[in-house]
Amino acid sequence: DPAGIGPELIARLLSQPETTRQANVVLVGDPWLWAEGQRVAGTRVETVPLQSLDAARTRTDSSHAALIAIDTVRAADVHRGKAEAAGGASVLKVLDTCMDAAKRGAIDAICFAPLNKYAMKQGGLEHEDELHHFAEYLGVTGYFCEFNTLGSLWTSRVSSHVPLKDAAGYLSKD
């Protein structure tokens, strides 16, 4: 979400060199937003330009993340901390671009920063959340769900429709 914390989270993550030692990381998005994320995070991350996701597998050196520059939203249309249609449409364009590449077999995985579902709905999302959008877009007809894993840590959703600031209130020991 261009108005949220995602760009700075990605900048902070990629400022740790071990991140790109574990995967061939390719960023897809607006160059101005990547620069802004780094500015907010107080870091500078070197990236190499890449023309398309179809070229991702041809990278022989993945020690630095690659950046595929696409124009999805004007900086003037993004207001930090505000859910707006322009930001939601931007997110959908980037996700759809990545899913198209996954369908072609050009990439193995998609990883994204926090999304604002309200902004996405304003921007054209026709589902309750991105998971259902993914399922329809990718033609999944069977059961699907989301689990996030990191080593032995597994997490799942509390709710798809609750702002992150309110999520703790939905948890209990039961």
Give the location of each predicted region:
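Glycine-rich phosphate/diphosphate-binding loop of Rossmann-like nucleotide-binding domains
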Residues: 157-174
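Short, acidic Gly/Pro/Ser/Thr-rich loop/turn segments
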Residues: 74-77, 154, 162-165
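Contiguous, glycine/small-aliphatic-enriched amphipathic segments in soluble metabolic enzymes
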Residues: 1-131, 170-173
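Short, well-ordered alpha-helical segments in soluble proteins
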Residues: 102, 124, 138-141, 162
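Mobile beta-alpha loop/short-helix "lid" or hinge segments that flank ligand
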Residues: 148-156, 160
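FAD-binding core/adjacent interface of flavoenzyme oxidoreductases
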Residues: 135-150
